[in-house]
Amino acid sequence: MASELDGLPVIATRREEAEGFLQGLVSKSLGWARKYSLFTYPFVTACCGMEYMTMASARYDSDRFGAAMPRFSPRQADLLMVVGTVNCKQAPILQRIYEQMADPKWVMAFGVCASSGGFYDNYATVQGIDRIIPVDVYVPGCPPRPEQVLDGIMLLQKKIQNQSHKLIDRKPLPVIAGGPGR
Amino acid sequence: MSEAKGVGGIDPRATPGSAGAGERPPMGTVSRAGDGELYAPMPSKHMVINLGPSHPAMHGVTRAVVELNGEIIEEMKLDIGFLHRGFEKSCENVTWGQVFPYTDRLNYVSSIMNNVGFALAVEKLAKLEIPERARYLRVITSEIHRICDHLTLVGAMAMELGAMTVFLYGIEARDLLWDRLAELCGARLTSNYARIGGVARDMPEGWQEKTLKVLDRVVAIREEIGQLLNRNRIFIDRCLNTGKVSREDALELGFTGPCLRASGEPYDIRKAAPYLVYDRLDFDIPVGSNGDNFDRYLMRMEEMRQSDKIIRQCFEQMAPGEIIVQDFRYALPPKPLVYGTIEGVMAHFKLVMEGIKVPAGEVYSYTEAANGELGFYVVSDGGGRPYKLGLRAPGWPMLAALPVMTKGSLLSDLIPTFDSINMIGGEVEQ
C-alpha cells in the first residue's frame, strides 16, 4: 500500500552529494585498476586445460589483457578460472580454494563442464560449479576456442569496471553455507 | 636410442665435466649431495606432506601423500578419482555411434587415437572391413595426434622444470597441427573423426600440401626444442638417473608404450600386432637403455620423428576412394539418398534413433595410443547400445608405479617422474 510519504522528493544534503561523487570517482578508478590486473588461479582438471595452455601461450597470449597472469596460489589470485570437469570428490577442494582467495575475487567457468556439467549427466559430476561457488562469467564450448575465452575475459573486465569498489569495505564477508571448516 | 643423438655427442667446446663433453655421470646410482666424503648431514625430521590435488605439478587431479625424511621420499600414497566422470557407465547409456564423444575425452591430448581404438573394437566385433583410404586417413590423423601428445608432454615437462620457452615452442607447433585438424574435422582438440566403418569426411582441397608444410615447420620447432633441452645442464641433472625403472620391473608393472620402450623392451603394438596399414609402412621403434626420465623424454622426441615419417609415407601411398563402408546398416547414407529415397530416410532414421546393431558377442581390441596400449573390451547383446564397455587405460599402470619409481629419491625428482609418465586424468580416472 502506497503511503503519502512516497511521493516526496528525497532530500540529499550537499555533503552527501559530494561524498557520493568522490566515492564514484574512487570506485571507477579502482575498477579500472582491478580490471587490468587480474591474477588467475587456474583450477585445471580436464580437457579444457589443453585449451587453457593454448590461450596462455604465444599465439593467443592472455597476458596482453593485463589479465590472466597465472598464480598457483589462491592467496595471490583474484580470478578463479575453473577449467574442466568438477566431480563430487573435487567439489570440496574447489570450494576451499575459492574461500582461500583474497577479496575482491571473481570466478570464470571455463567450458561447459564447469558451467553446467556438460554432457556428463551422471552421478559423479557436479552439474555446474555455480552449485557450490558463485560464478561471474560462463564461457561455453567443449572445449571453448581461445577466442571465446578472451571474449569472456573482456566481458569480465567490463563487469568489474561497472561494479562498485570501495577503498575499505566494512561489509561482513559473504559466508558460503556448509563450507569446509564450519 | 637408435641414433646417437642427445647427450652422447661430444663437443670439444663444451665445459669440461659437463654432459656435453661426453662425460656422463656414472649410471645406476642416484647421485646425491650426501654421497661425498664432505657430507655434513643436517638434522632432518620425518614428515608427511600432501601434494595436490590442486597443485600445478600434479596436473590438478592427483593427490600424493608423501612421507619424507628430510628431502628423501620414504613412502608415497596416491589418491585418485578427482576426475572420475563415469566413462564406462555413460557409454552404456548411449548408442554405439554416440560413444565417440566420450572416447574423445579419455586422453584428450590425442583424441583421434581413442576414436580409432574404439572404432576398431566395434569393427572387430561386427567383422567389418573398412575401405583403404579410410585406413590411411585414420593412420594419418592418429600420428598427427601422437605428435601433438608428445609435444604437449615435452612442453609441460620442460615448463615444470623451469624452461618456459620450450613450452611456448611446443604449444606453437601443436597449434599449427590443431589448425589442420580443425580444417579436417571441425574441432581443435576433441576432434571427432573416426566412425564405425570408416571416417567422417575426406580431406579438404589442398589439405595434404598444407599439412606437409606444417610438418616441416613442426620438424624445425622440434629440432629447436631438442637443441634447448638435449644438452641443457639443468634439464639433464633433473632427468638423468631419476625415476628409473628396469626392464623387468617395467614388464612386471604392466608398462606399455614409450615408458616401456624407454626401459629397453622393444614392444610396440604397431609392429607386434599391426592394425590398419601399419604393416605397409616403414618406421622404427626407438628403444631406450636406461629407463630414466631422460630416456623417456628422448623416446618422445624420437617417436615424433617416426610419426612424421609415417604421415609422409601415408600421403604417398594413399589413393582416392571410399572413406566409409557403403553398408547402410553401419554408416549413414549420403544426404541425396536421405532426401531423395525412402530407403535412405529409413536407414538414416534407424541409425540415428536406434543406433547400429552390432552382433552379440564380446571382443578385446587394442591399439598403440600415445601412452601405450589402449584396450577396449566391448560386450554386445545385439542391441543398439553397448551392453558393457571396459577400458584398459595406458596411463594407469605407470601412475600406479609412481610410488615404486620415486621411493628413495628426492622430493624434487617426483616432478619430472610424474611428468614423463604422461598421466592424463581423463583416461586414468575414466
From Swiss-Prot, chain A:
Keyword Cell membrane: yes
Keywords: 4Fe-4S, Cell inner membrane, Cell membrane, Iron, Iron-sulfur, Membrane, Metal-binding, NAD, Quinone, Translocase, Transport, Ubiquinone
GO cellular component: plasma membrane; respiratory chain complex I
Matching InterPro entries: NADH_UbQ_OxRdtase-like_20kDa, NADH_UQ_OxRdtase_20Kd_su
Gene Ontology biological-process entries: aerobic respiration; electron transport coupled proton transport
Pfam families with a match to the protein in the record: Oxidored_q6
EC number: 7.1.1.-
Protein origin, superkingdom: Bacteria
Gene Ontology molecular function terms on file: 4 iron, 4 sulfur cluster binding; iron ion binding; NADH dehydrogenase (ubiquinone) activity; NADH:ubiquinone reductase (non-electrogenic) activity; quinone binding
Record protein name field: NADH-quinone oxidoreductase subunit B 1
Curated annotation (Swiss-Prot), chain B:
Topological relation to the membrane, as annotated: Peripheral membrane protein
InterPro entries cross-referenced by the UniProt entry: NADH_Q_OxRdtase_suD, NDH1_su_D/H, NiFe-Hase_large
Reactions it catalyzes: a quinone + NADH + 5 H(+)(in) = a quinol + NAD(+) + 4 H(+)(out)
Keyword Mitochondrion: no
EC class name: translocase
GO MF annotations in UniProt: NAD binding; NADH:ubiquinone reductase (non-electrogenic) activity; quinone binding
Primary localization class, coarse: membrane
Superkingdom, natural source: Bacteria
Region span, Disordered: 1-36
Record family assignment: Belongs to the complex I 49 kDa subunit family.
Assembly notes: NDH-1 is composed of 14 different subunits. Subunits NuoB, C, D, E, F, and G constitute the peripheral sector of the complex.
Stored HAMAP family: NDH1_NuoD
Job description of the protein: NDH-1 shuttles electrons from NADH, via FMN and iron-sulfur (Fe-S) centers, to quinones in the respiratory chain. The immediate electron acceptor for the enzyme in this species is believed to be ubiquinone. Couples the redox reaction to proton translocation (for every two electrons transferred, four hydrogen ions are translocated across the cytoplasmic membrane), and thus conserves the redox energy in a proton gradient.
Listed PANTHER family: NADH DEHYDROGENASE [UBIQUINONE] IRON-SULFUR PROTEIN 2, MITOCHONDRIAL, NADH-UBIQUINONE OXIDOREDUCTASE 49 KDA SUBUNIT
Protein name as it appears in the record: NADH-quinone oxidoreductase subunit D 1
Species, as recorded: Anaeromyxobacter dehalogenans (strain 2CP-C)
Top-level taxonomy: Bacteria, Pseudomonadati, Myxococcota, Myxococcia, Myxococcales
